[in-house]
Amino acid sequence: MTTTTTFKGVDPNSRNSSRVLRPPGGGSNFSLGFDEPAEQPVRKNKMASNIFGTPEENPPSWAKSAGSKSSGGREDSESPGTQRSNSSEASSGDFLDLKGEGDMHENVDTDFQANLAQMEEKPVPAAPVPSPVAPAPVPSRRNPPGGKSSLVLG
């Protein structure tokens, strides 16, 4: 005959239980089989740690290529981010000439600012007040949205 060992919980005066409520050392009872370090290593480059703050001393390589060009030997080549934006602009039909790239970005920016200023200056008309008009009478025979009836004759 086998016996079941019963464990005591956290309080030695409590009643017997077949569950361990907390491991003897305290904390988590999840173990991977090896000793884990007491503190988590601090990551230097967190993605969302400093979105609008001061720029870091060593920004990641993708940030260098998307922002201002570095003084390295890559001044003549376009960055991958620029090529992606060109392809998306070309597919939208707004940007077809790839040679005047710098001028086009400036024109788009000034056009956007001009449109934004015009939108801010326009007064928003008040919502029209619905007049108490009786709704149109519902016809006795309704057609489906396609306009053709599904009624089969003869």
Swiss-Prot record:
Keyword Transferase: no
Signals that turn on the gene: Negatively regulated by the microRNA miR-132.
Basic and acidic residues compositional bias, start-end: 96-108
Keywords associated with the record: Acetylation, Cytoplasm, Nucleus, Phosphoprotein
N-acetylthreonine, modified sites: 2
Tissues expressed in: Expressed in yolk sac, fetal brain, brain, spleen and bone marrow.
Modified residues (Phosphothreonine): 54
Modified residue annotations for N6-acetyllysine: 148
Comp. bias (Polar residues): 1-19, 79-91
Compositional bias of kind Pro residues: 125-138
Residue numbers of N-acetylmethionine PTMs: 1
UniProt subcellular location: Nucleus; Cytoplasm
Residue span of region Disordered: 1-154
Protein family (similarity comment): Belongs to the JUPITER family.
Function of the molecule: Modulates negatively AKT-mediated GSK3B signaling. Induces CTNNB1 'Ser-33' phosphorylation and degradation through the suppression of the inhibitory 'Ser-9' phosphorylation of GSK3B, which represses the function of the APC:CTNNB1:GSK3B complex and the interaction with CDH1/E-cadherin in adherent junctions. Plays a role in the regulation of cell cycle and cell adhesion. Has an inhibitory role on AR-signaling pathway through the induction of receptor proteasomal degradation.
Quaternary data: Interacts with the complex composed, at least, of APC, CTNNB1 and GSK3B; the interaction takes place with the inactive form of GSK3B (phosphorylated at 'Ser-9').
Protein name from the UniProt record: Jupiter microtubule associated homolog 1
Organism for this UniProt entry: Mus musculus (Mouse)
Taxonomic placement: Eukaryota, Metazoa, Chordata, Craniata, Vertebrata
